[in-house]
């Protein structure tokens, strides 16, 4: 008997220790909704294959906020592929064309910016005027919505310009998407023949170069992991992020997280999104 017990003890000693595993992703989302007193819409999808890995309120509408800028630049790149646009085309504008939060475009009133530079500013710095300057080429909000319909997204819609599109009124369908629709659209833009391989690489690189997302998913990303993302922020507690991430510096999954109708501060919203992402990553690694 003593020998048997020693064998069991020796066997247990060789097993890996389970260290205080965090909550499962859906448990974390429920906790976040409780702490935020608001709603979370979320989906996790494989980038290469159809199917949903994790979802919560994935078919409910949430304000898009600045996450629409990825789709906007995707539509612009589709025009480049078709020969109707050039990333090198210079756009000139006046001070009265600027809206709130234009950290890049406000510095180029004298010389203007190219389409490529405006997309970089819109995605990497979330420059609002850059987005507005790009919208006319795709037909404005209605034209961008038409582009979405053409690529099979029958849900996502843009109705207004920056900065009015961030109003996020409860129950207002304007300027909204669902986590599922946004994730599917991202997959189409980055993996299907909707864009050329060159344009796909460019769109992804702009997202890799995002400089205003450090307090969200990037704050919990393990060393050596890949991430490309775009954030959004709006009124009435609206906050969101669309991202591609994966281990070994490879994009493997799409993660979309939206918040709405919460009195939480921006710091609290960022923390909750980071917490949800952290739970997803931990579950992924198990």
From Swiss-Prot:
Residues of the active site are 66 (acyl-ester intermediate), 164 (proton acceptor)
User: Which species does the entry assign this protein to?
Assistant: Enterobacter cloacae
Note the PROSITE patterns from the entry. BETA_LACTAMASE_A
Other information: The class A beta-lactamase family has a specific amino-acid numbering system, sometimes called Ambler or ABL numbering and often misspelt as Amber. A multiple sequence alignment was used to derive a consensus sequence and then the consensus was numbered taking into account insertions and deletions. This allows use of identical numbers, e.g. for active site residues, despite differences in protein length. UniProt always uses natural numbering of residues, hence there appear to be differences in numbering between this entry and some papers.
Task: Name the top EC class.
Answer: hydrolase
According to its UniProt record, which protein family does this protein belong to? Answer: Belongs to the class-A beta-lactamase family.
Where on this chain does substrate bind?
Answer: 230-232
Per UniProt, the keywords (alphabetical) are: Antibiotic resistance, Disulfide bond, Hydrolase, Plasmid, Signal
Which InterPro entries does the annotation name? Beta-lactam/transpept-like (IPR012338), Beta-lactam_cat (IPR045155), Beta-lactam_class-A (IPR000871), Beta-lactam_class-A_AS (IPR023650)
Signal peptide positions are 1-21
Q: What name has this protein been given in UniProt?
A: Beta-lactamase Ohio-1
Task: Keyword check for Signal, yes or no.
Answer: yes
Does the record bear Hydrolase in its keywords? yes
* Disulphide bond pairs: 73-119
| NCBIfam families noted in UniProt | bla_class_A (NF033103), SHV_LEN_OKP (NF012143)
Q: Which SUPFAM superfamilies match?
A: beta-lactamase/transpeptidase-like
List this protein's GO terms for biological process.
Answer: beta-lactam antibiotic catabolic process; response to antibiotic
Question: A single GO molecular function, which one?
Answer: beta-lactamase activity
* Chemical reaction(s) catalysed: a beta-lactam + H2O = a substituted beta-amino acid
The UniProt entry, under Gene3D superfamilies, shows: DD-peptidase/beta-lactamase superfamily
Enzyme Commission number(s) of this protein: 3.5.2.6
């Amino acid at each position: 008997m003593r020998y048997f017990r020693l064998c069991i003890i020796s066997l247990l000693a060789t097993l890996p220790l389970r260290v205080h595993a965090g909550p499962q992703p859906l448990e974390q989302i429920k906790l976040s909704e409780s702490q935020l007193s608001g709603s979370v819409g979320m989906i996790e999808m494989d980038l290469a294959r159809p199917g949903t890995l994790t979802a919560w309120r994935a078919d409910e509408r949430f304000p898009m906020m600045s996450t629409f800028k990825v789709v906007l630049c995707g539509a612009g790149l589709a025009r480049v592929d078709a020969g109707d646009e050039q990333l090198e085309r210079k756009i000139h504008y006046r001070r009265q064309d600027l809206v709130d939060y234009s950290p890049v475009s406000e510095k180029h009133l004298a010389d203007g910016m190219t389409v490529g530079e405006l997309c970089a500013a819109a995605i990497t710095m979330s420059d609002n005027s850059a987005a507005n300057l790009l919208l006319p080429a795709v037909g404005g909000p209605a034209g961008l919505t038409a582009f979405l319909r053409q690529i099979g997204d029958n849900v996502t819609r843009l109705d207004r310009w920056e900065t009015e599109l961030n109003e996020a009124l409860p129950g207002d369908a304007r300027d909204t998407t669902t986590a599922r629709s946004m994730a599917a659209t991202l997959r189409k833009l980055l993996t299907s023949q909707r864009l050329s391989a060159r344009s796909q690489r460019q769109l992804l690189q702009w997202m890799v170069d995002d400089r205003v997302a450090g307090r969200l998913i990037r704050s919990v990303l393990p060393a050596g992991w890949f991430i490309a993302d775009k954030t959004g922020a709006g009124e009435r507690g609206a906050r969101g992020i669309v991202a591609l991430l994966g281990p070994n510096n490879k994009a493997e999954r799409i993660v979309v997280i939206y918040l709405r109708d919460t009195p939480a501060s921006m710091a609290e919203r960022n923390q909750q999104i980071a917490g949800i992402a952290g739970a997803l990553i931990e579950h992924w690694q198990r």
